[in-house]
Amino acid sequence: MKEDNKSNWAEWAIKHRQIVYFFSVLVLVMGIFSFKTLGRSEDPSFTVKQMVVSAAWPGASAKDVEMHLTNTLEKQIQNVPQIDKITSYSRPGTCVITVYLKDEVPSSQVRQRWLELRNMVNDIKKDLPDGVYGPYYNDRFDDVYGNIYALTGDGYSYEDMRKYAEEIKLDFFGIPDVKKVELVGVQPEKVYIQMDTDKLAQLGLDINSLAEIIKAQTAITPSGMVEADKSNTYLRLTGSPDSLQNIADIPINANGKVFRLGDIAQIKRGYADPPESKMYFNGKPAVGIALSMEDGGDNIRLGKNLAKEIKKIQSELPLGLELNQVANQPEVVKNSISEFSESLYEAIIIVLVVSLFSLGRRSGYVISCCIPLILLGAFCGMYALGIDLHKVSLGALVVSLGMLVDDAIVVVELMEVKMSEGWERMKAASYAFKTCAWPLLCGTVITCLGFMPIAFSDSSASEFASSLFPVMTITLLLSWLVSATLAPVLGYEWIRPTVIKEESYDTPFYNKFRSLLQWSLSHRALVVGITVGLFAFSIFMLNFVKKEFFPASVRPELLVELNLPEGSSIKTTDEAAQKLTKLIENDEDLDHVSTYVGKSAPRFVLVMDPVQPRDNYAQLVVVAKSIEGRIRMEKRITKLAADNLPEAIVYSRSIPLGPPAPYPVMLRVSGDNDAQVKEYAQKVRQVMNANPEVTMTRMDWMEQSNAVKLKIDNDKLLQMGLTRQTVAMALQAQVSGYTVASYLEGDQDIDIVFRLDPDQRADITQLETVSIPTSQGAVPLAQVATLEYGSEDNMIWRRNLRPTITVNGAIVEGVTGNDVTQKVYDDLKELRSNLPAGMKIEIGGSLEDSNKTLKGLLKPVPVMIILIMVLLMLQLQDIRKLIIIVITAPLGMIGVIFGLLLFNSPLGFMAELGVLALCGTIIRNSMVLVDQIQQHLDAGMEPMSAITESAIVRFRPIMLAAFTTVLGLIPLFFSQFWNAMAVTMACGLTGATLLTLVVLPVLYAIAFKVK
């Protein structure tokens, strides 16, 4: 491309230095403001495209719920556009359906899809079985409760703690950046009316009639309104129950007499029995207070404001009540940003030192002044685009740091060379721009395009890392702009002509390199063969690189999940969870532990998926004093659980750095027949157990729970004046209690529950003796029903409307879940080839997500390749040159694979991003070399000499650019999140640069038949 002097930016900038300085200072000031204003968080936000639809059908078995409730809802839900998958589980009396949208659905349309789903499901409410409550919807899964506090107090009841927690909740709402405040582990109070069946029978009452009397006395109903000439007067009835005494005073008409309810029944107040989900802090009962932050808020500022408020609250709490911090996201964010800031500072120092030593003092000063301007300009761009400071955006700045000086180095070095040859300063600056500016811009855009697939991929992992592309693009384009304007100005001001050097490339080093090039050009076939062999060998070695979607984080938390057999009561789970807590409470590495029974902890970090409530499930969030302590504790907890809780499956895991998977190894078995699915799931589990790298296998649906079927004799019911409802209510009252009404007390809606005296509540072995009250007296259940003892499924899982069992497994130390999953799946080859029609065995978990993400990441690659080729063609204007450059791009894989093996880094999502980004950088370097060959040819040099001398002339700037990029990446080698990408880019660029300087000249000579 030819350059008109009128559009020579460097010359214009030097002539208008005051304007350049003004805008440079303006960018510096705006950049500092932007940096201080940017939101701060640990992870970038991304849209969780899932929704939970739940419904209750009291009294129905899991199979009935699946067939008549879950199935009906799922069939309607699948008609919603852009549904990716539907998973569900059905339990006795409950179904929970999780709906996932396709990754391609834009975040802006997610709420609209959920509204459509609500409307479509509401349309079929009338078709649901009688007695169904709901459906209920939850689509707010992206709220992160990063600050959790536990209120504990010896001698304080749950209700006492709840009241204080409610007051604290109101205080928190007044703090800037607070979005939501939720209470965790609250135990609702209930009023229990207890009496025996004989008393009911004597009074001629049944539970249904008693319930109607109590409900009529506690209901709030309109009493009318008197319309006057100028105002309306509302009539209010007083005396509705608002205390135990008022409930005891409710009149009961029975056998022609009026009794006080308190005279014929015992009235007590207590907590829900069985209890609701519970929370403990360091083994003490607790009420949790969880806060989420406003979108775009500043976590560090929120942390400071919370610290002030907590100090005030603690000073006002009564003696014995303690407010403890369970999760402290602001502190995590502060440490995370501090870590990446240190990496950024280290990278800046490294690049500055390299620039000073390689370019000399004055040229180094020019580069040193460009770096802060580019970085602060990047902060301005981030502020304009609404990109917060977090691990991805800060990491992107570190990655770009080594590249952002490349353009300035080329311009400044060329100015220095021309000035050393006696050129006048303005002419040298003008020549540097005219010669390098547009090829460098083309190369910069190509480098940016290498990151494009991250931004335009439709996977959740890509959305997680999507800020990488805009931050890199802003930074690198700014670096080109600065190299075209400020760098020439500063070079004009500071660089002084040096002694003219004759034959500056006639040194021992360059002579040896020239000899290597000449030998390579004389043995072209051998060089190409060696290169192809190295590439093929590296691809073979790829089999030995470990695969991991996202590594574990460096957070101190350890998530310990406890699963008891299906059908276990929440009380049993509570006992097991407390036992496990006691086993670890004195561990030397433990800082604190919070225990959640019946459900998981709130989502206190974005990359954590909360578990839906289950009676047989508990979660311990163990916070260690250090990362090393966390690793030690994980091993000890596994052994303690195996030795002391053999009835439970206890699995511990650290929090991942990206989208999570519940277990490292996950395989799904789906089919049309429940029995077949169970049979083949058991076979899959056997194969999984046979793998020495897999431990603690479990299936999410297998065990059955006890059940008793009551065959009612309708004729006897008729003779005794009973109904099925009367029998059901009598059974419920005697087994678990029957809610007959509720009343308002303060801000609470308290249920009134009727149940029989404790000594009359039946156990499973005495069901036949349960008394059923009739008008003639109580009769045993055996007189009206035949009992059949058996078992039934307590949980039925489905995926896309088909019965599905997921077989899960943990892994031993030193292997990755993706590698082990693939091995187990390969071991199932024979079983998979002989499956009955309709049966499927599929990969799940992290490996499935990884494959899906890679597929999504590759979708935009054709567009990226086309854009890169268009730019190359416009710049080079020769198809053979374009082909040569494109061929060199894969050479980076040689260094990538050997680098991953050398540093024991996994091939995962971040490494895949590094490979794509690396291609753009390699193409950029190759283009610069090809452009130099053309310049020498245009100057009249012989083709062979042009090829050789171009590689020599460009050796220093290309190596220097690669060297600064690689050294700038070194701080990220120590980052858990960025390690794989840093290793990929550093090792790939090192290998590709060395090969490019030798192989590209050979390919050029072959393509153009240079002799």
Question: At which residue positions do the language-model features occur?
Answer:
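Solvent-exposed, membrane-proximal periplasmic/extracellular interface segments of envelope transport
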Residues: 7-8, 65-139, 198-219, 240, ...
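Hydrophobic transmembrane alpha-helices and their membrane-interface caps
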Residues: 30-37, 349-416, 474, 867-954, ...
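Transmembrane helices with small-residue packing motifs
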Residues: 18-19, 25-60, 122-131, 383, ...
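Transmembrane alpha-helices and their membrane-interface boundaries in multi-pass membrane transporters
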Residues: 401-415, 436-456, 463-503, 620, ...
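Signature of alpha-helical transmembrane segments and their immediate interfacial
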Residues: 2-40, 434-436, 502-550, 591
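Solvent-exposed, non-transmembrane alpha-helical starts
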Residues: 22, 61-68, 105-115, 145-150, ...
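Extracytoplasmic/periplasmic membrane-proximal domains and adjacent transmembrane bundles
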Residues: 2-5, 12, 54, 125, ...
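Helix-loop junctions and hydrophobic alpha-helical segments within the transmembrane domains
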Residues: 9, 326, 337, 412, ...
